Every structure is written in C-alpha cells, then in structure tokens.
Amino acid sequence: MDFVSLVNTVNSFVWGPYMLVLLLGTGIFLTLRLGFMQIHTLPYALKLAFSKHQDETSEGDISHFQALMTALAATIGTGNIAGVATAYVLGGPGAIFWMWVTAFFGMATKYAEAVLAIKYRTVDDNGEMAGGPMYFLEKGLPDHGLGKILGVAFAFFGAFAAFGIGNMVQTNSVADAVASNFGVDPLITGFVLAIFTAAVILGGIKSIGKATGIIVPFMAVFYILAGLVILAMNIGYIIPAFGTIFSSAFNFSAGFGALIGTAIMWGVKRGVFSNEAGLGSAPIAAAAAKTDHPGRQALVSMTGTFLDTIVVCTITGLVLTIAGLKAFPGLTDLTGASLTAASFDALMPMGGLIVTIGLVFFAYSTVLGWSYYGEKCFEYLIGTKGIRLYRIAFVLVAFWGATASLPLVWNIADTLNGAMAIPNLIGLLLLSGVVVSETKAFNEIRKNEAKNA
C-alpha cells in the first residue's frame, strides 16, 4: 500500500460511521444530562454574546464577544459555502435537516467543551490564558497518566491540523476563487494573504480578537443579507424548499433506508465540519475570555454552533434547494463552492461575486482563528518559547498553500482534524459530571442575579 492509499484508508476510518456515532452520541448524552439546556438558555446566551456591557474585570485576555468571534472566525469558513453544497449533492436536500439535528445536539457539546476549558485553564509564562482539551484532559483525568496521554495526543493532532485545514486549504480556496473570478495570479494572492495574516497573528490573541471582532460580524451579515435578499425574491419557493428538505430527510419511497442513511451520514459529517462541535477547537478560544464563571462563557460559546449552522448554513441550504427546484441548467454538474456560487448567481444578479467575496473573508478569518488554536496546541507541547517561530511558520505556510496542489494535504489535515475529536470526546464523556456540577452552580448564580435585578 502506497502512502496516498494509506492516508485515504486512515481518513475513511477516522471519519467513518463510528466517529459520526461518537460525535452525535456524545451530543445526545450531554443534552440529556444537561436537561436540554440549549433550548431554554439560548435567548439568554445570545443576549450575553451581543451585550454592549462585556465583562472587563474578570480574569482573561479578551471579551466574551471577541472569544466568540475568534471561534466563529475559525468555524464559519469554506464549510458554510462548499461543505453545505457537498452535503446537498451527496446526501440530497435531506442532509440539511440532519445538519440541523447535529447542530442542536452539538450545542450541548460546545457548551460542555467550554465549561471544562475555562474551569481547567491556566496562565502561561507570557501571562496569557491557556486552555482547551489538552489542559482539561490532563488536569481533569490525572489518574494513571491517562489525561496527559490524551492531552498530548490532542495537542499533537491540533498543532499540525492547523497548518492544513486551518491554513493551506483555506488560502488555496481563496487563491482559486480569486484567480477564477478576477484573473489574479495565485502568487500575488498568496503574498497578500501572508502579509495580512502576519499583521494580525504576530500580535497574539488580543490582536486576533480585535480583528475577528470586526471581520466576522461584517462577513456574516454580508453573506446572510445576500441570502435573505434571494429568499425574499423567491418567497413563494421557501415553503416548498422546506418541504423538499423534510421529505428528503424522511424519504419513504423505494430504497428509502439507503437514502435516509446517506442523508444522515453527509448531514452529520458536514454539520460537524461546519460547526466543529466535538472537535475541541473552539474551547481553546473560550478559555481566553474574561468571565466570572465557566458557565457564563460556555453559553456564549454555545451560540457559535447556532449561528454557524442554524443560521448561515441554513441560508446556503435554502438557496441551493430553491435553485434546484427551479431546475436551472448546468447546476446538476457542479458541487462544492462552484454549485453555491452558480446557485446564487442564477437567483440574483452578481450572486456569484457575492459568494466569492464571502469565501475570501470566510477563509481568511478561518486562518486567523486556527492560527491561535494551533499555537496553543504547540505551546502545550514545547512551551511558550517557540510561539513566535510557530507564528512565522504559519505565515509562510499561508503563502505556500495559496500556490500548492493540495489533494494529499487536504486528506492528511482532514484526518488529523478528525483525530483531534477522539481524545476530546473521551474527556467530555468522562468529565460530564463536572460539567453538570458547574452548570448547577451557575444556575444558582443566575437565580440570585434575577432576584437582585
């Protein structure tokens, strides 16, 4: 077996049915243990996330909002444009429904990750917060060295996955899109991306937090508004589009079992790719937030899954479904970002250009968010002395990624990304009692706050 075949085999195993069951199963388990908390706490969580009065006095490096925007920067990426289209093509419109299901249970997973990340976070040699699965695994599961082993495994996979899925794959997508639409040489695009990446990440988490606090709201609103305009222009197709999604998710025609199975597989897989619930990446950003209690920031982190999948991915999914219902010629031969761009373009003048611009911002912000994730994993492994070197390497790889051919790199990074989830999910299941305890304590704080309000 050659190296490429080996990578593909390992990738198929890592992202096979067992992983998808583990990811979704952990979300269901945590949802039950936490009493479906994502339903009754979502309004309060959204209020916390977007409140003008951010916590500036508690321990931490950045605000609630900046921590959420940093996580969303890494989360809202090409998966929201290309990933949804891939799920739509390979799993049918019903895959979108299963993305919603994954997001619902993933909100509990994202909440639990953040609770543990903040509870077990520490201050590094530079005086900055350091947290995430590697720390809560080591501190929360100290017996027989299991936690340390799992923590090192997570950090190793995360440090290298950041260069692939969070860097080269993103800059390559930008270079391809800009070259296709504007004829710009990938070398030029790569150079510009490297300069802009360096300008932000060399300043550390505070610089990243400030940048993502501006870029993410702008790019999300820009893309969502464009999608809403298309939906308004095709308002008569919205209900039929939802009908198509639901009927495809529960297709009771001949061979429905295989059809439903395919829809579930691609919906869950692309849903996880999009919102990253269970991968263990987002809690690294949550650990940097200024907060008085793990539960408070965890609720803010939970909204990331809602905003990413229930809002942004739904916009993409509805546009794709409406374009499919209108049966525009040429769409059936496309997939990924090309299908999304063509669908937007068919339904609105300059729609394809909007998708291209959105893709550029989404991918660039992903590079910023993942640079911090990779840096913190690297720091856990070798200490703070190598951080600047890691940042410089990240900038250089951003340039290389824009000009390289990446099929093998994508599969390796994809595999490492999935491998991150395994130690993280083990930790979430074994430490679920801690999450429940912290949640009960925070609920008491909220009750007292309500009485004194």
From Swiss-Prot:
<feature type="topological domain" description="Extracellular">
    <location>
        <begin position="234"/>
        <end position="258"/>
    </location>
</feature>
<feature type="transmembrane region" description="Helical">
    <location>
        <begin position="187"/>
        <end position="202"/>
    </location>
</feature>
<feature type="topological domain" description="Extracellular">
    <location>
        <begin position="90"/>
        <end position="92"/>
    </location>
</feature>
<feature type="transmembrane region" description="Helical">
    <location>
        <begin position="18"/>
        <end position="32"/>
    </location>
</feature>
<keyword id="KW-0029">Amino-acid transport</keyword>
<keyword id="KW-0915">Sodium</keyword>
<feature type="topological domain" description="Cytoplasmic">
    <location>
        <begin position="431"/>
        <end position="453"/>
    </location>
</feature>
<keyword id="KW-1003">Cell membrane</keyword>
<feature type="transmembrane region" description="Helical">
    <location>
        <begin position="409"/>
        <end position="430"/>
    </location>
</feature>
<feature type="binding site">
    <location>
        <begin position="273"/>
        <end position="274"/>
    </location>
    <ligand>
        <name>D-alanine</name>
    </ligand>
</feature>
<feature type="transmembrane region" description="Helical">
    <location>
        <begin position="301"/>
        <end position="322"/>
    </location>
</feature>
<feature type="topological domain" description="Cytoplasmic">
    <location>
        <begin position="379"/>
        <end position="386"/>
    </location>
</feature>
<dbReference type="GO" id="GO:0005283">
    <property type="term" value="F:amino acid:sodium symporter activity"/>
</dbReference>
<keyword id="KW-0472">Membrane</keyword>
<comment type="function">
    <text>Catalyzes the sodium-dependent uptake of extracellular D-alanine and L-alanine. Can also transport glycine. Binds glycine and both enantiomers of alanine, while strictly excluding other amino acids.</text>
</comment>
<feature type="transmembrane region" description="Helical">
    <location>
        <begin position="387"/>
        <end position="403"/>
    </location>
</feature>
<feature type="transmembrane region" description="Helical">
    <location>
        <begin position="149"/>
        <end position="179"/>
    </location>
</feature>
<feature type="topological domain" description="Cytoplasmic">
    <location>
        <begin position="33"/>
        <end position="67"/>
    </location>
</feature>
<protein>
    <recommendedName>
        <fullName>Sodium/alanine symporter AgcS</fullName>
    </recommendedName>
</protein>
<feature type="topological domain" description="Extracellular">
    <location>
        <begin position="1"/>
        <end position="17"/>
    </location>
</feature>
<feature type="transmembrane region" description="Helical">
    <location>
        <begin position="68"/>
        <end position="89"/>
    </location>
</feature>
<keyword id="KW-0769">Symport</keyword>
<dbReference type="GO" id="GO:0005886">
    <property type="term" value="C:plasma membrane"/>
</dbReference>
<keyword id="KW-0406">Ion transport</keyword>
<feature type="binding site">
    <location>
        <position position="170"/>
    </location>
    <ligand>
        <name>L-alanine</name>
    </ligand>
</feature>
<feature type="binding site">
    <location>
        <position position="170"/>
    </location>
    <ligand>
        <name>D-alanine</name>
    </ligand>
</feature>
<feature type="topological domain" description="Extracellular">
    <location>
        <begin position="180"/>
        <end position="186"/>
    </location>
</feature>
<feature type="topological domain" description="Extracellular">
    <location>
        <begin position="404"/>
        <end position="408"/>
    </location>
</feature>
<feature type="topological domain" description="Cytoplasmic">
    <location>
        <begin position="275"/>
        <end position="300"/>
    </location>
</feature>
<feature type="topological domain" description="Cytoplasmic">
    <location>
        <begin position="112"/>
        <end position="148"/>
    </location>
</feature>
<comment type="similarity">
    <text>Belongs to the alanine or glycine:cation symporter (AGCS) (TC 2.A.25) family.</text>
</comment>
<dbReference type="InterPro" id="IPR001463">
    <property type="entry name" value="Na/Ala_symport"/>
</dbReference>
<feature type="binding site">
    <location>
        <begin position="273"/>
        <end position="276"/>
    </location>
    <ligand>
        <name>L-alanine</name>
    </ligand>
</feature>
<feature type="binding site">
    <location>
        <position position="75"/>
    </location>
    <ligand>
        <name>D-alanine</name>
    </ligand>
</feature>
<feature type="binding site">
    <location>
        <position position="75"/>
    </location>
    <ligand>
        <name>L-alanine</name>
    </ligand>
</feature>
<feature type="binding site">
    <location>
        <position position="79"/>
    </location>
    <ligand>
        <name>L-alanine</name>
    </ligand>
</feature>
<feature type="transmembrane region" description="Helical">
    <location>
        <begin position="93"/>
        <end position="111"/>
    </location>
</feature>
<feature type="topological domain" description="Extracellular">
    <location>
        <begin position="323"/>
        <end position="350"/>
    </location>
</feature>
<feature type="transmembrane region" description="Helical">
    <location>
        <begin position="207"/>
        <end position="233"/>
    </location>
</feature>
<keyword id="KW-0739">Sodium transport</keyword>
<keyword id="KW-1133">Transmembrane helix</keyword>
<feature type="transmembrane region" description="Helical">
    <location>
        <begin position="259"/>
        <end position="274"/>
    </location>
</feature>
